[in-house]
Regions:
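Active-site beta3 strand of CheY-like receiver
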Residues: 45-51, 56
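The feature encodes the CheY-like receiver
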Residues: 57, 66, 75, 87
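Conserved acidic carboxylate
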Residues: 9
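Charged docking surfaces used in two-component/phosphorelay signaling
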Residues: 16-24
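Short hydrophobic/Thr-rich beta-strand motif most characteristic of the beta2 strand and flanking loop
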Residues: 26-33, 41
Length: 123
């Protein structure tokens, strides 16, 4: 069974990099480019995991995470935050709002994302 991942990312370049990496593992990737469409896609498609950027053009990733975790129909879906923000307080905020992991976008971002997905049993 192929797992479905929802990526909420406004950078086309970053989304393509992640898409290419996850395709190597046979994962189905849905992409939303802003917070509102990411929230709607989560409710509509019920992905196995949401990979969520923090800095989005409308709702930020923290607000999207809070909305998912406050909706009893989708609160069970794990959320991994993948973001440029790498300060300790950002990581703490991400985990406090319900993310299961918080990954900075650096040279190891895709590799760390794959490892996080392994830990969740998606790979």
């Amino acid at each position: 069974m192929s797992h479905q991942i929802l990526l909420v990312e406004d950078s086309r370049t970053q989304a393509l990099r992640i898409q290419l990496e996850l395709a190597r593992y046979g994962l189905k990737l849905l992409i939303a480019s802003d917070g509102n469409s990411g929230l709607e896609a989560t409710r509509t498609h019920r992905p196995d995991v949401v990979v969520l950027d923090v800095d989005l053009p409308d709702l930020d990733g923290y607000a999207v995470c809070r909305a998912i975790k406050s909706d009893p129909t989708i609160e069970h879906i794990p959320i991994i935050m993948l973001t440029q923000r790498d300060a300790a307080h950002d990581t703490i905020t991400g985990l406090q709002v319900g993310a299961v992991d918080y990954i900075p976008k650096d040279s190891l971002a895709e590799e760390n994302l794959v490892e996080a997905l392994r830990q969740l049993g998606v790979l």
